[in-house]
Regions:
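Charged catalytic cores and adjacent phosphate/nucleic-acid-binding surfaces used
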Residues: 2-33, 44-170
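Short loop/edge segments at beta-strand edges and connector loops
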Residues: 36-38
Length: 170
């Protein structure tokens, strides 16, 4: 995400450069395929933090909230639902924003989120990082009953972080 400067988020030029590199590797390694994906911030108004012409170049887009956690339940729910109506969003990441023992989940109407996710074919992530474990397992049955596809993500910021996926499937 280009607004996530603290996490080394890519500006538009970096995204374009990365795409050229992925395309070159795909040509070289065929039939092996590297998918081009990114985590994009969901801004306060529900838009994603890259323009549509950039988003259109990805195979998948995980969109998450990384700021402005203090909105009301209605505002936060509307924000997330607007984002899921983007034709480019593939997965809702960090669906409640919680960090275990550090930050409570932001207020959000998950049943409405599940309904909009199912209608727009947006998967909802189980973030398997042991500091998050978000989406809480106790609401997974409601998500599935609403017809939502579940995605398991390791929230890996390095190679060792890939091992976190075990906490999402274990």
């Amino acid at each position: 995400s280009q607004t996530a400067v603290y996490a080394g988020g890519l500006k538009i030029e970096g995204v374009k450069k990365q795409r050229v590199e992925i395309d070159a590797l795909n040509k070289k390694l065929s039939p092996f395929v590297i998918f081009a994906g990114i985590e994009s911030d969901i801004l306060a108004d529900g838009s994603l933090d890259y323009p549509d012409d950039i988003l259109a170049g990805f195979d998948f887009i995980i969109a998450s909230i990384h700021s402005r956690f203090n909105l009301s339940e209605k505002e936060m729910t509307d924000r997330v639902c607007r984002a899921m109506e983007s034709r480019y969003m593939t997965i809702l990441g960090d669906p409640t924003g919680r960090l275990l023992l550090a930050r409570e989940a932001y207020p959000i109407d998950l049943d409405r989120v599940f309904e909009v996710a199912a209608a727009n074919r947006v998967a909802i992530e189980i973030n398997a990082d042991p500091h998050r474990l978000d989406l809480d397992w106790r609401v997974l049955a409601r998500a599935r009953a609403a017809g939502v596809t579940i995605s398991i993500g390791a929230d890996a910021h390095n190679l060792a972080g890939l091992a976190n996926v075990e906490f999402g499937i274990g």
